Each structure stands twice: as structure tokens, then as C-alpha cells.
């Protein structure tokens, strides 16, 4: 059964990161995550500054930024996150053994654990991936970090369903503080065992139904009523012919109204 608790009630979460996220969602009245996949630092920062007031979370693919640097990309991005009060989710989709992901998360060119509040991982390599990522976070920063497991995807033909999804949920159960939830298309349960997982859902659109590369879109009401806590929207916010200011408020309101409808159903 989908939870009808308010974000304020859920801010008693055992994870400091989840607690912070629920609190800012309530204070800003938004459950919108902007997925900003652009190729330059200038485009990224400009869009984030515009969308910042409407979002609780920014989702990045930092490895597609052609002119990336910690100084010119990450530093100003962190300043914008403070100015507009949102968290940062690096959509890295880790998928290797624990020792390897530990190095990938903490080091390399992107040093993700230093600046991203949240990251995510596939469950294909087993439980060691959670341990490796958590160790990297603890050894890199004193700031709280959170992990989302990829339980389901929005792309046509995805293998992330059935037994794979069930096993991924079992992996998430191994760490109540660090594993804060899932990338999924619906509620993942767990409340009977004391878990309050955050469900973030990609492939959400108010207008389009899909694209030529297999993306499939569902409506805001559809995903939130099914258990989604945070809607992830990309091209719907800033695609060709769209005004990010107008679309940011449009999706913020749609997401918040859908949440209030679910909450009022208790």
C-alpha cells in the first residue's frame, strides 16, 4: 500500500540525508527533480540558476560536461545549491565490485563523493556495491550522503523488473542509513520491516508520451499516486521551445498537487 504520510512526518527518517531532503521538500513545496543533461558548464549553471527555485533536487550526468572542472563546474554548482536550497544527485549508475566503485566514487576526475549528496547504483554485482560506496563516502566527507538503488527503469525493453527488482530491494535492506530509496516506477514497500524508502521516478511528462530512443513518459498524477515521492523531469523543463521558468513552476505545481491529493487520501 502506498504511503499517505506527509513529507514532514517522514522527516523523522533514520538517514540524515533523507531527513534533510524531506524537510526542504516541505519548506519549498516541491517534489521536482530537474534532470539537466547539457554539454557545457555555462549551459548547466544557467539552467540550474533558472530552475533552482522550483526544485528539491538536481540530477546531473557530470561526465557529459565537455569542459568540466572542480573549480569552474562543481564549485559554482554547490553555490547555486545553497542559494536555491536544493540537493544534488549525480546519476552515475555504479555497476561494479565494491572495491572498484569505491575508487570510482571517491576519486578519478569527478570526485563524486566530495560534492554529490546522492548517487545511485545497479544491483547486478551484489551487496558489496553498497558497502564499497558507503566506505568511500565515509572516508571522503563528513557531510551526509545517500544511495538510490536502480530497481526499475523507464526505458522500453528494460530488464529491470521481476526477480531483478526483488533482489535489488533485498540489497537495499542491508543498509538502512545509506540506502535511502530507489529509482523505480512504483512503491517498493518495506514499511512493514521498518523502511521508509524514497521513490524517485524518471520518465515523467505532462505533454510527450515518449521519444525515438525508447524513453516512455507517464503523467505526474499516475506516478505519484503509484508511490513516487520525487518526479524526475528533463526535456519537459527545457527542451526545444520550452521556457524553463514557466515549465519549472508548471511541473512543481503538478507534482505538489499530486502529492497533496495522495496525502489527503489518508
Curated annotation (Swiss-Prot):
Active site: 93
InterPro entries tied to this protein: Aldolase_TIM, OMPdecase, OMPdecase_AS, OMPdeCOase_dom, RibuloseP-bd_barrel
Top-rank taxon, per record: Eukaryota
A Gene Ontology cellular-component term: cytosol
Pathway it works in: Pyrimidine metabolism; UMP biosynthesis via de novo pathway; UMP from orotate: step 2/2
Reactions the enzyme catalyzes: orotidine 5'-phosphate + H(+) = UMP + CO2
Alphabetical keyword list: Decarboxylase, Lyase, Pyrimidine biosynthesis
Top-rank EC class of the record's enzyme: lyase
Enzyme Commission number(s) of this protein: 4.1.1.23
Residues that bind substrate: 37, 59-61, 91-100, 217, 235
Pfam families: OMPdecase
MF GO annotations: orotidine-5'-phosphate decarboxylase activity
Gene Ontology annotations of biological process type: 'de novo' pyrimidine nucleobase biosynthetic process; 'de novo' UMP biosynthetic process
UniProt-listed NCBIfam families: pyrF
Family indicated by similarity: Belongs to the OMP decarboxylase family.
Protein name per the record: Orotidine 5'-phosphate decarboxylase
Organism of this sequence: Cyberlindnera jadinii (Torula yeast)
Gene: URA3
Amino acid at each position: 500500500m502506498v504511503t499517505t504520510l506527509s513529507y514532514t512526518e517522514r522527516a523523522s527518517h533514520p538517514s540524515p540525508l533523507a531527513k534533510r531532503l524531506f524537510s526542504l521538500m516541505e519548506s519549498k513545496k516541491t517534489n521536482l527533480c530537474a534532470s539537466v543533461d547539457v554539454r557545457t558548464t555555462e549551459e548547466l549553471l544557467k539552467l540550474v540558476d533558472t530552475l533552482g527555485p522550483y526544485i528539491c533536487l538536481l540530477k546531473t550526468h557530470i561526465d557529459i560536461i565537455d569542459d568540466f572542472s572542480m573549480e569552474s563546474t562543481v564549485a559554482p554548482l554547490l553555490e547555486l545549491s545553497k542559494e536555491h536550497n536544493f540537493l544534488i544527485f549525480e546519476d552515475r549508475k555504479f555497476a561494479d565490485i565494491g572495491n572498484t566503485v569505491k575508487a570510482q566514487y571517491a576519486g578519478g576526475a569527478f570526485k563524486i563523493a566530495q560534492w554529490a549528496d546522492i548517487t545511485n547504483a545497479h544491483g547486478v554485482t551484489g551487496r558489496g556495491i553498497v558497502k564499497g560506496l558507503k566506505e568511500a563516502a565515509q572516508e571522503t566527507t563528513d557531510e551526509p550522503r545517500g544511495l538510490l538503488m536502480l530497481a526499475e527503469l523507464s526505458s522500453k525493453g528494460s530488464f529491470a523488473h521481476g526477480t531483478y527488482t526483488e533482489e535489488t530491494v533485498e540489497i537495499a535492506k542491508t543498509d538502512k542509513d545509506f540506502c535511502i530509496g530507489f529509482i523505480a516506477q512504483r512503491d517498493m514497500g518495506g514499511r512493514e520491516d521498518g523502511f521508509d524508502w524514497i521513490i524517485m521516478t524518471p520518465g515523467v511528462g505532462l505533454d510527450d508520451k515518449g521519444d525515438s530512443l525508447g524513453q516512455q513518459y507517464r503523467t505526474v498524477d499516475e506516478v505519484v499516486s503509484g508511490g513516487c515521492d520525487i518526479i524526475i523531469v528533463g526535456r519537459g523543463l527545457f527542451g526545444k521551445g520550452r521556457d524553463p521558468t514557466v515549465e519549472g513552476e508548471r511541473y512543481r505545481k503538478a507534482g505538489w498537487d499530486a502529492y497533496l491529493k495522495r496525502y489527503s487520501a489518508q
